[in-house]
């Protein structure tokens, strides 16, 4: 994600600045990183990522297996097709950077109250925030930022809002150093997605974590307020595939004495992206949560864009994929959210392709025409919980798009000819489109036309009954929405998007 890259890049610069100003206690270890490609397709994907990252100004490059071995001599080079090297990457101590942020905030006049639980959020008749109630008293304010981590859904519920995320069990193991094979402090972070693990140095030994194949949610209905400074029971059976992958790539680990397997919950959103921005319908209430295992890496950038959102009314980056408004009422279904979060976690290290479809938590929402479409041989994809037709295979049974799409990679998918025939039929004859899953809005009143003419990039002033395909633009000329406007009559318009 270009947006996530930019947020992380800003964070790195900020942490470098802190160290340059003498904050050596933040635990920022700028040791670089290696992301290994243990398959040809993984190497192709990494090369694509490198091209995009360089376009954003990141210092990153693709290196050979031999060069990777020179940087991290403890890895087994068998099967490595290449790697990505990021010299400015690293790892840091969460406690150290949190304390540094708190220290600098206090120096700017911020009051920090610990062990203080929010019990309610007051709102006026228009729904805007007026105050926060706590077990230590009431705070008058018109701006609230919900940065409550895995407790964020419970806090948002106080204003009737949805912030969908579910804590996932996330484990890592630490080992003692191996005499004669102590890892130096400058050991780079190593990630091997094909083997499911990541690794870094910890007091001369190994710290190994990863993404289990059968992820488990925890406290999906809400995390208890008093769950603090606690861990979950270790689960070696769950962690086994990660450990096996690490041992394949780094056999030396087998000689290390295990200190402990750490199991700590971390909140994951249904699509793996942050939840940021103002909550629709609750003026003054903002969310900065759902970090989905990228919290520390993006923290500095998230703080910057949240400040911009509050002060300027918009962030300096295009954050549509992270905007909290992307989640509608259907994400109030806890089971649906939990299954989507599990899918994101399960596929976190899998290779992704343009034609990929989500496979879990399907049939959440169906059109009234679903059965008729299925009878016509529809192949269904998923969009925002809706089962939507990707294309038809006339005369064949209906099906859901599945893992078989991975075999096409970045190449031409075999269904292109089917879609071509559908396009020709729509152009030359008559076609019926199921618009159930699209959003529909009505804009009406004396100022309706003027408003639409201002925000749309096409001419909306057409005769009654006209359809205008257009985009809504922001103040910078960027696209906010792709839509069709139907002029129902005079000053009444229907928007379909």
Say what each PLM segment does.
Residues 1-71, 194-199, 204-205, 342-354, ...:
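Dinucleotide-binding Rossmann-like beta1-alpha1 core, especially the glycine-rich loop
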Residues 6-9, 36-45, 84-107, 113, ...:
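Short beta-strand to alpha-helix junction loop
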Residues 29-33, 168-170, 261, 490:
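Short Gly/Ser/Thr- and Asp/Glu-enriched loop/turn motifs at secondary-structure junctions
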Residues 84-143, 151:
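Helical element adjacent to the flavin cofactor pocket in flavoenzyme catalytic cores
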Residues 119-122, 259, 277, 486:
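Conserved positions in beta-strands of structured domains
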Residues 120-234, 241-250, 335-347, 353-357, ...:
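Flavin-dependent oxidoreductases
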Residues 194, 203, 225-365:
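C-terminal catalytic lobe of FAD-dependent flavoproteins
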Residues 324, 328-497:
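Glycine/proline-enriched, intrinsically flexible loops and inter-domain linkers
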């Amino acid at each position: 994600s270009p947006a996530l890259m930019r947020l992380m890049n800003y964070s790195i610069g900020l942490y470098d600045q802190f160290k340059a100003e003498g904050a050596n206690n933040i635990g920022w270890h700028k040791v670089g990183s290696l992301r290994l490609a243990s398959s040809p397709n993984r190497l192709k994907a990494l090369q694509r990522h490198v091209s995009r990252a360089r376009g954003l100004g990141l210092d990153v490059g693709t290196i050979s297996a031999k060069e990777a071995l020179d940087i991290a001599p403890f890895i087994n080079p068998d099967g490595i097709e290449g790697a990505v090297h990021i010299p400015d990457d690293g790892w840091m101590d969460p406690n150290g950077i949190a304390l540094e942020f708190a220290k600098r905030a206090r120096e700017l006049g911020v009051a920090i109250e610990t062990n203080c639980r929010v019990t309610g959020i007051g709102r006026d008749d228009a729904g805007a925030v007026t105050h926060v109630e706590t077990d230590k008293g009431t705070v008058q304010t018109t701006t609230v930022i919900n940065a409550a981590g895995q407790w964020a859904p419970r806090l948002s519920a106080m204003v009737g809002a949805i912030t969908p995320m579910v804590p996932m069990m996330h484990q890592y193991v630490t080992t003692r150093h191996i005499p004669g094979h102590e890892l130096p402090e400058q050991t780079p972070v190593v990630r091997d997605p094909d083997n499911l693990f990541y690794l870094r140095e910890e007091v001369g030994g190994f710290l190994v974590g990863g993404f289990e194949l059968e992820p488990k949610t925890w406290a999906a209905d809400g995390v208890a307020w008093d769950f603090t400074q606690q861990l979950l029971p270790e689960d070696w059976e769950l962690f086994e595939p990660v450990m096996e992958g690490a041992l394949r790539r780094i056999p030396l680990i087998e000689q290390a004495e295990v200190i402990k397997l750490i199991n700590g919950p971390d909140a994951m959103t249904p699509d793996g992206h942050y939840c940021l921005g103002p909550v629709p319908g609750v003026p003054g209430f903002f969310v900065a949560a759902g970090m989905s295992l990228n919290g520390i890496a993006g923290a500095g950038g998230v703080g910057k864009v949240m400040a911009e959102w509050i002060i300027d009314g918009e962030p300096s980056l295009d954050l549509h994929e992270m905007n909290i408004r992307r989640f509608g009422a259907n994400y109030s279904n806890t089971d649906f959210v939990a299954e989507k979060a599990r899918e994101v976690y399960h596929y976190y290290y899998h290779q992704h392709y343009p034609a990929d479809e989500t496979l879990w938590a399907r049939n959440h929402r169906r059109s009234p025409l679903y059965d008729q479409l299925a009878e016509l041989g529809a192949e269904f994809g998923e969009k925002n919980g809706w089962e939507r037709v990707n294309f038809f295979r006339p005369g064949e049974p209906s099906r859901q798009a599945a893992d078989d799409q991975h075999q096409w990679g970045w190449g031409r998918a075999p269904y292109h000819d089917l879609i071509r025939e559908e396009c020709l039929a729509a152009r030359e004859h008559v076609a019926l489109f199921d618009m159930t899953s699209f959003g529909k809005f009505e804009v009406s009143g004396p100022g309706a036309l003027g408003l639409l003419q201002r925000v749309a990039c096409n001419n909306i002033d057409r005769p009654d009954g006209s359809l205008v395909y257009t985009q809504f633009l922001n103040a910078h000329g960027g696209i906010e929405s792709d839509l069709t406007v139907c002029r129902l009559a005079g000053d009444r318009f229907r928007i379909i998007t």
